[in-house]
UniProtKB/Swiss-Prot annotation:
Organism superkingdom: Bacteria
Record-level GO cellular component terms: cytoplasm
UniProt family annotation: Belongs to the NAD kinase family.
Active site annotation, chain numbering: 78
Biological function: Involved in the regulation of the intracellular balance of NAD and NADP, and is a key enzyme in the biosynthesis of NADP. Catalyzes specifically the phosphorylation on 2'-hydroxyl of the adenosine moiety of NAD to yield NADP.
Species classification: Bacteria, Bacillati, Cyanobacteriota, Cyanophyceae, Synechococcales
Main location: cytoplasm
Official protein name in the record: NAD kinase 2
Stored Pfam families: NAD_kinase, NAD_kinase_C
Enzyme nomenclature, EC number: 2.7.1.23
UniProt GO MF annotations: ATP binding; metal ion binding; NAD binding; NAD+ kinase activity
Keywords: ATP-binding, Cytoplasm, Kinase, NAD, NADP, Nucleotide-binding, Transferase
One example of a Gene Ontology biological process annotation: NAD metabolic process
Length: 302
């Protein structure tokens, strides 16, 4: 009997209710279902007064999940998808994202598509789209103090009521750059429509093999977003006396001290999205973010 995963946002009543329907339909279709909570993919925030420990990003893999899982259905919003990515990517498990949240930018299907979903799943008619993910590591000397996998971005910024930050950033073998700003964002193409977009960064189509560095409120007219190859590792050195906050995928992360450095590199484990139909990125931008909509009504051609 093929094994499949069901990752649910247990904090949302609609997701929990929908999970019961999905589990029954999957079992009736001949699948063994391993149901887990998306909370297992949440990172949490480390205590700034205690020494951080790193269990590696594999620690987010749920109990009962292994490489024999054919696919996992994810029920929730975009935050749930980001958590599920950390739970599945290390094992190479494809995810089918079903929106029970709000915007659903990362959703492939909706609750109104249930019949269509099961028709494709039972017939195993789908394609896989691979999205770049990142490994983010906080290093002190040769020791890794904290590590996580992320799909969208890593944001490193000042705490409230502290002064502007200074960063020295090295991209691959290029000359290091100095940035003075409230923070910096290192994002994937998937993350280019998230925090980076709000900070003035460009939208990047998901198939581009690049990463993006975006300053947050920089104190320079010359400081702008930079796009570069995703084969280039990035090192961020905090050049400021105060501790900084690092947030991964908008949910949680850790504190970074002046003696630490942050390493970011492309992960060997892309996030695999199941596509039931052609995924047209520009149409998603139009529908979800209003990109490319006409500002005036077009004349009737009839």
């Amino acid at each position: 009997m093929p094994r499949v995963g069901l990752i649910v946002n247990d904090g949302k009543e609609l997701a929990v209710k929908t999970a019961k329907t999905f589990q029954k339909k999957l079992e009736d279709s001949g699948f063994e279902v391993v149901r887990v909570s998306s909370a297992g993919g949440l990172l949490g925030f480390t205590n700034p007064d205690q020494y951080m420990s790193s269990q590696g990003y594999n620690s987010c893999i749920p109990e009962g999940f292994d490489s024999s899982i054919l696919f996992a259905v994810v029920l929730g919003g975009d935050g749930t998808v980001l958590s599920a990515a950390r739970q599945t990517a290390p094992l190479g498990i494809p995810i089918l994202t079903v929106n029970t949240g709000h915007l659903g930018f990362l959703a492939e299907a909706y609750l109104s598509d249930i019949d269509k979903i099961f028709k494709h799943l039972v017939a195993r008619q789908w394609s896989i789209e691979k999205r770049t993910s990142l490994v983010v590591s906080v290093m002190r000397g040769d020791q890794c103090r904290w590590e996580a996998l992320c799909l969208n971005e890593m944001a490193l910024h000042r705490e409230p009521m502290t002064s502007m930050c200074h960063f020295e950033i090295s991209v691959g073998r290029h000359a290091p750059v100095d940035i003075s700003a409230d923070g910096v964002i290192l994002s994937t193409p998937t993350g280019s429509t998230a925090y980076s977009l709000s900070a003035g960064g460009p939208v990047i189509t998901p198939d581009c093999p690049v990463l993006q560095l975006t300053p947050v409120s920089p104190h320079s007219l010359a400081s702008r977003a930079l796009v570069f190859s995703n084969e280039e590792p990035v090192t961020v050195f905090p050049a400021t006396p105060e501790r900084l906050m690092m947030v991964v995928d908008g949910s949680a992360g850790c504190y970074v001290w002046p003696e630490d450095r942050v390493l970011i590199r492309k992960s060997d484990h892309p996030v695999k999205f199941i596509r039931l139909s052609d995924h047209e990125f520009f149409q998603v931008l139009r529908n979800k973010l209003g990109w490319g909509l006409p500002h005036v009504a077009k004349p009737d051609k009839t």
